[in-house]
Design a protein with these regions (language model features):
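Positively charged n-region of N-terminal signal peptides that target proteins for export
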Residues: 1-4
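Mitochondrial intermembrane space
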Residues: 17-92
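N-terminal signal peptide c-region/cleavage motif recognized by signal peptidases
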Residues: 7, 12-14
């Protein structure tokens, strides 16, 4: 009976993506979450890191306009699905 709470706790934790289908779903979620944050005109390209880090999905985004190309990084919390976009990198 004492093991029952432990079992419920394990069942409540998110599953770790380990199958090819789970990783593909993770990449699609990361891409969709990051693209939803782009509020700029222009052609958008995105490169999603296949696995991210332990806690975050990561993507690089580029927005190309007539004025040039802005590059940004997007991170998505794997547990909550919340995504954030950095300010554009400066050209040096």
């Amino acid at each position: 009976m004492r093991r029952l709470p432990i079992l419920f706790a394990l069942l409540a934790t998110p599953a770790l993506a380990s199958s090819d289908d789970a990783w593909q779903e993770f990449r699609q979620l990361t891409e969709a979450s990051c693209l939803a944050l782009i509020d700029m005109p222009g052609e958008v390209t995105i490169e999603v890191n296949p696995f991210g880090s332990d806690q975050f999905g990561v993507a690089l985004l580029s927005v190309t306009t007539a004025a040039g190309t802005d590059r940004m990084a997007c991170i998505m919390n794997k547990q909550t699905g919340a995504a954030e976009l950095t300010a554009p990198f400066t050209n040096q």
